[in-house]
Regions:
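Alpha-helical scaffold domains
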Residues: 1-182
Length: 182
């Protein structure tokens, strides 16, 4: 028998309104977060992608709810293959990197930072959609403020790939390259 949460995830769609509704439901019912995260992180689960769609909004609104799951997220991140889950996962990485950089934000351990950096660099090198690559670049740029070598690696990857990508990718990377060249 499916739980109420599983039914809600199953009924959700890619439409923003649906994803926001489910994320608000999870925020209001924090006791369901563990089950929700388990579904999102189980890449064999038929609802894994749908759960990730709404997890992005949970993290955008209440990132601190996600902190107990950071180690597990770092473990699952490189294993995510479905493009529809990769995009929200890389966006969550961006939220984590930005929050980690703020004084009153969440604190990632050095090991978590290294796991994120490794997974994000892999995403840039792999054949991913532009949105996923842009979120990965933004997260790496922030993480590179602490680890200088990350900026050098990011710059090298962007410059090598620049001519081979779409106009959308080139537009997104142009400003980042300017910041990296300062």
């Amino acid at each position: 028998m499916k739980t109420d949460l599983v039914n809600k995830i199953n009924q959700s769609t890619a439409h923003r309104k649906s994803r926001v509704y489910l994320s608000n439901y999870i925020i209001r019912h924090e006791e369901l977060l563990n089950e929700f995260i388990s579904i999102a992180f189980d890449i064999q689960n038929e609802n894994h992608v749908k759960a990730f769609w709404s997890l992005e909004f949970v993290c955008e609104k209440k990132l601190k709810l996600f902190t107990p799951y950071l180690d597990l997220f770092c473990e699952v991140l490189p294993k995510i293959k479905d493009d529809s889950a990769v995009r929200p996962a890389t966006k969550i990485c961006m939220f984590l990197a930005k929050s980690n950089h703020r004084k009153n934000g969440i604190s990632l351990s050095q090991e978590q930072e290294h796991h994120l950096i490794e997974a994000l660099i892999d995403r840039l090198i792999q054949d991913e959609k532009v949105a996923s690559k842009v979120y990965a670049m933004k997260a790496l740029f922030v993480l590179g403020k602490k680890y200088d070598w990350v900026h050098e690696e990011l710059k090298t990857i962007i410059e090598q790939d620049y001519a081979n990508h779409t106009a959308a990718y080139q537009a997104a990377t142009r400003n980042l390259l300017k910041k990296l060249n300062k």
